[in-house]
Every structure is written in C-alpha cells, then in structure tokens.
Amino acid sequence: MALHLLLLFGACWVQVASPDSLQRTTMLPSTPHITAPSTSEAQNASPSVSVGSGTVDSKETISPWGQTTIPVSLTPLETTELSSLETSAGASMSTPVPEPTASQEVSSKTSALLPEPSNVASDPPVTAANPVTDGPAANPVTDGTAASTSISKGTSAPPTTVTTSSNETSGPSVATTVSSKTSGPPVTTATGSLGPSSEMHGLPATTATSSVESSSVARGTSVSSRKTSTTSTQDPITTRSPSQESSGMLLVPMLIALVVVLALVALLLLWRQRQKRRTGALTLSGGGKRNGVVDAWAGPARVPDEEATTTSGAGGNKGSEVLETEGSGQRPTLTTFFSRRKSRQGSLVLEELKPGSGPNLKGEEEPLVGSEDEAVETPTSDGPQAKDEAAPQSL
C-alpha cells in the first residue's frame, strides 16, 4: 500500500512540477548570459527539485541519471554556461563535475552516476520526474530525450520506482539504476517514449521486446505442438476406420450368404419331404395293387367255385355265368380294390339268397355229381387252367 501511495504521490508531483519546468525552460533562453547560482540557492532548490536538468534549459544535457548527447557545434558561451551550472550543482550535492573541455565527450557518450549524500535523515524518499519537451530554443539537444532523477536520503522505507514518458515520437528511452545506502533494494527509474522510436536504446526496451518475442514464440510452439498432437491422434483413427469398414463390409456378405444357404436348405428339406410323401403313396398303392392282385385273383377263383357249386344244378345258364366270371377272373390286370368289393358284395348277395332257396337244396345236391362230371370234362377243353380249378374242389 505504501508503494502505491508513493507512486500516486510521485505522479501528482510530476504533473505539478511539469508546468514549472516548462516555464523555466522557456524563460531561460531569453537571457543570453546566465550567472551561476550560489550554493545557498542550490541547497534550497535541491530538496524540492531534482538535480540536473530541472533548473537548466533544454540545452543542458548533463543529468545524474540520464544519458544524452550534445552536438559538437556548441559555442564557447554555451560551454561556459554549462560549466557554471555544473559547478553550482557540484557545490550543492557534492557530485563530481567534469571539466569544460571534456563536457562534450562526457555528455555524448557517458552517463553520470547518482551522488551519494552524506547526510542521512528520516525523511521519505523524494522522487521527481522531468519530461523533456521541445522548446523554441532547444536546437542542440536531441529531441525526445527523457531524464528522470530520484534522490534518496537514506531512509528505511522501501524504495520506489517512477516511470516518466515523453510525448515525442523519436528518441531513445533512458533507464538508470541508483544505488543508495538504504536497507531496501536499489531504486530503478525508467523513462520511455510513447511513440515509436527509430532506434531502441537501453536494456528495458530490449528486454521487453525480447520477452514479447519469447512469449509469442512460446505460444506459437504450443500451438504447433497441439496441432501435432491432434494430427497424431487423427492418424490412428484414419487407420482404424478402413479396418472397421472392411470388417463391416465382410460381415454383411457373410450374413447374407448364411441366410441364403439356410433358405436353400429349408427348401430342399420341404421338397424332399414332399417327394417322400409322394413316393410313399405310390409304393403303398403299388403294394396294395400287388396284394390286391393276389387277393383279387384268389377272390374271383373262389367266387366261381361257390357259384359253380350252388348254380351247377340250376342249369346251363348258371354255368355260362360261371364261365363268364371265370373269364373275368382270368384278367388280373383289371382287378382292383373296387372289383374286390364288388366280388364281396356278390358273395354277400349269394349268402342272403341261400336261406331263401332252402327247398331247392335237395334238388341241387343230386346234380352235383353231374356238375363234377362236367367239371371233369371241361379240363379237356380248357387245358391246364381247368386242372388248377379242379384241385380246390377235390380238396
């Protein structure tokens, strides 16, 4: 908090002190000859105003904390004025003052150090900043040179840092480090121009630019590293996607092939079952035909025997009917279950007729011998078939 308050106080002091310095810089060039101030006046002005360019016009370039340049085209009058001012400043603050002959070289290439005051007091540090502006008679001074001074009188409070800037667009920034006998760290004052400067002078400016460049480079590298990481993560995805697509493309035809094969197998099984059912019906029908043929052959053979035994005494008409039945029985290819049923129906009809023909049984028993004789005579005409028919009768 103390540092912030001191900074605010210093800024206000700079704003208050700047119009005074402007008045002094504008009033001094009007007098061609300036006498050196006495030591008492310098001592009275030193606590309130910074030593150096505060009481000198814009032509003065020697300041304890600034590095400025003076062109070589100075007149002897100006050098004498500068030397007189230097002697007055040296008498007030006990600073080493260069000789008038070496003032040009010192002002052009060297920077003055902060004087170390011998008096130690408990007063707070006084910090003042003097922005340099271009006046009407500021011909030999380089434009845009800002110098700031800070005088510390050996206090125990932490030192402060004051930064002043000039509104000029050209000129280097001056930064000086002041070593004091206080217990705190050294005080650093830096001044910089608000506008762009053609040449960068001073370590703070170079370090600031280098820090900006390093931060930009670091950000660039971080962005590039992120890009590489994203590309590295995208590569496996691109390599995995074809495998997944290929596996999916392979699975689909496999499933389709399995479905088709299962459908074909089901159709084949159904067709085979139908074939088996059809062949089973044919075999059963064929077996029935064969069995039916045998049964039908046996049936008609028996029916004519019964009819022959029952109708032999009735006359020749019945015998002719028996022959017709025998003739029909000799054709086994035409016999079926239906014909067999007919034969059974005929046998049932004959059985029903037997009880009704009871009185004729005695008459029928007598001609049986004659019927047998006829049956014996018939083999001669019919051949071996008649013998086969005669065998069951004898049995």
Swiss-Prot record:
According to the UniProt record, list the residues that bear Phosphoserine: S285, S328, S339, S343, S347, S371
User: Topological domains (Extracellular): residue ranges?
Assistant: 20-248
Q: Which GO terms describe its biological process?
A: apoptotic signaling pathway; cell surface receptor signaling pathway; defense response to bacterium; leukocyte tethering or rolling; negative regulation of cell adhesion; negative regulation of T cell activation; negative regulation of T cell proliferation; negative regulation of type IV hypersensitivity
Q: Where is the signal peptide?
A: 1-19
Q: Which UniProt keywords apply?
A: Cell projection, Glycoprotein, Membrane, Nucleus, Phosphoprotein, Signal, Transmembrane, Transmembrane helix, Ubl conjugation
Q: Where is this region: Required for interaction with EZR, MSN and RDX and for co-localization to microvilli?
A: 272-302
> Where does this protein chiefly localize?
membrane
Residues the record lists as Phosphothreonine modifications? T333, T378
Positions of transmembrane segments: 249-271
* Impact reported for T279A: No effect on its interaction with RDX
Q: Where is this region: Disordered?
A: 27-245, 303-395
Q: How does it sit in the membrane?
A: Single-pass type I membrane protein
Q: Which GO terms describe its cellular component?
A: basement membrane; external side of plasma membrane; extracellular space; microvillus; plasma membrane; PML body; uropod
InterPro entries named among the record's database cross-references: Leukosialin
Q: Where in the cell is it found?
A: Membrane; Cell projection, Microvillus; Cell projection, Uropodium
Q: Which purpose does this protein serve, as stated in its record?
A: Predominant cell surface sialoprotein of leukocytes which regulates multiple T-cell functions, including T-cell activation, proliferation, differentiation, trafficking and migration. Positively regulates T-cell trafficking to lymph-nodes via its association with ERM proteins (EZR, RDX and MSN). Negatively regulates Th2 cell differentiation and predisposes the differentiation of T-cells towards a Th1 lineage commitment.
User: Would you tell me the protein name for this molecule?
Assistant: Leukosialin
Q: Which organism is it from?
A: Mus musculus
